[in-house]
Every structure is written in C-alpha cells, then in structure tokens.
C-alpha cells in the first residue's frame, strides 16, 4: 500500500480526515482527486450558466431546468452543490460587493472625509438599479435572501464603524451591525421603488442619503455639503462606466462574454 504525506494533503482534501488520508491506497487517492476535480468543474459550469442567465433574463425568471441545460450538468449534481438559487446568488454577491467601496473612494477626493465616499457608493448602487432591471433584481434579492443579506451586513459593518465611529464612541461592531440591518432595509426599499417623473433619480438619492446620514448622526451642515458634492457628479455616466466594468469583471471570473446590448455568448 502506498502512503502519502497526510499533513500536506489534508489541506487539499478538507472532506477527509488525516487518518483517512493516511489509510488510502493509490486507487482510492486517485479516485478522490478525480471526484474533487470533477466537482470543481461542475461548480464552475453551474456558476457560469447562472450568472449569464441572471444578467440576461433576470434572477426570478431563471429556472433550475434552464440552469442545468445551460451548464450541461445533471439536475442531481446541481442540487448537490447548490440546494437553492440563493447559494449561487451569494457567490455572485461576494464578487459584486468585493472592492465596491474602493471604487467610491477613487471617485471621491481622498482629502475629503470618508463619508463622501460612502455617499458616492450608495448613490452608485441606487443608480445602477435604475440603469439595468436585471441588476435591480439581483441587488434586491441580495438584500433580501438571508445568506446574502448577512454577507452584506458583515461586509458593511467595518466600513460603517470606520466612517461613523466618531459619532458613536461607545458603539461596538455589534452595534453597527444592528444599525446596518435597518439602513440596509432602507436601501432595499429605495432600490425596489422605480424612478419616474414624480420621483426622479436625483430626488431618490437625496432622500435616501438624508435619511441615512441622519441615522448615523452626521451634522446637518455636513449633510448639506455631502449632498452638494453628489449633485456635482454625473452619477448616471459614472454608474454606466461602473456597470460595464462590473460586467467585464464577471465575464473574467465566470468565463463568459456578455454583449453590451444584454445578449450573451460563450467565451471562445
């Protein structure tokens, strides 16, 4: 019986204990490696298909049957890896929100207080959902589904504490986490309400930021300055650029090609 370096292999085979690895013969080890690689390839196919379909036709309109047909995998394999669509949405949400605040920081002058970057970030999210209905649906679902909402709360808590901690000197991470549950709910509600002639984007952004900044005890004078700064930006043009950069990032990660008119084609 061939023996293997269990200490090094256990990190690559987390679903096996050290003792299991030590006792493996060559054939068993090869089979485990094959199954793991096969599972990884199946997962990638499913994620690629899902992201394409979500962006092309919307989250709710994408069925399990469409996903498995697009991915070319068995329904059982799909359900084994992703019992619900929400599990796939979590992977997509992590990709979309990763580095999102960094984009806002690059737009806001680094010499300005970080509350300006926060305002830009939230204004961009609201604007993105007005530019693309499928993105609106993805964002709303992300703020609604328990796993993705939890990711957003945790992901945002540290930023909130860094930005607004001075206004709440006795608040812990838990306090900011609990506040974010409320403000994230506010964000979801504003995203869900589509803009129209009676409620234009500029008013939506202004109303939302005023409510948010009051929650975090930003002085009225500072609020006015932040809102004035946002009004100087061509937020639709910036959001459009951000949207296409987001699409490009998703194309690269999930290995597909999304055309600018919303149609997708397989990456060659």
Where does each model-flagged region fall?
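C-terminal peripheral helix-coil segments that are non-catalytic and often amphipathic
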Residues: 6, 10-31, 162, 166, ...
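Hydrophobic alpha-helical connector segments
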Residues: 91, 102-137, 144-145, 153-157
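Hydrophobic/aromatic residues within well-ordered alpha-helical segments
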Residues: 85, 92, 96, 100, ...
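Short, hydrophobic secondary-structure boundary micro-motifs
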Residues: 136-141, 221-225
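Helix-turn-helix
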Residues: 45, 53-87, 91
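Amphipathic alpha-helical packing segments from all-alpha helical-bundle domains
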Residues: 141-195, 199-213
């Amino acid at each position: 019986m061939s023996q293997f370096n269990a200490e090094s292999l256990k990190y690559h085979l987390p679903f096996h204990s050290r003792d299991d690895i030590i006792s493996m013969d060559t054939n068993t080890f090869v089979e485990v490696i094959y199954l793991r690689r096969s599972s990884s390839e199946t997962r990638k196919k499913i994620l690629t298909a899902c992201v394409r379909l979500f962006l092309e036709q919307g989250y709710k309109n994408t069925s399990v049957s469409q996903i498995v047909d697009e991915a070319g995998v068995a329904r059982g394999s799909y359900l084994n890896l992703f019992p619900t669509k929400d599990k796939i949405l979590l992977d997509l949400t992590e990709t979309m929100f990763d580095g999102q605040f960094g984009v806002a920081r690059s737009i806001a002058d680094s010499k300005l207080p970080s509350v300006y970057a926060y305002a830009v970030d939230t204004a961009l999210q609201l604007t993105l959902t007005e530019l693309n209905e499928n993105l609106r649906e993805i964002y709303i679902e992300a703020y609604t589904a328990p796993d993705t909402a939890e990711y957003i709360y945790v992901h945002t808590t540290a930023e909130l504490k860094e930005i607004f901690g001075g206004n709440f000197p006795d608040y812990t991470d838990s306090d900011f986490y609990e506040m974010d549950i409320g403000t994230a709910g506010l964000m979801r509600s504003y995203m869900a309400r589509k803009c129209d002639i009676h409620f234009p984007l500029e008013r939506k952004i202004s109303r939302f930021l005023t409510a948010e900044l009051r929650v975090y005890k930003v002085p009225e004078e500072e609020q006015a300055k932040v809102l004035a700064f946002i009004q100087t930006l061509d937020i639709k043009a910036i959001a459009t650029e951000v949207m296409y950069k987001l699409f490009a990032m998703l194309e690269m990660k999930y290995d597909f090609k999304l055309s600018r008119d919303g149609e997708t084609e397989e990456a060659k």
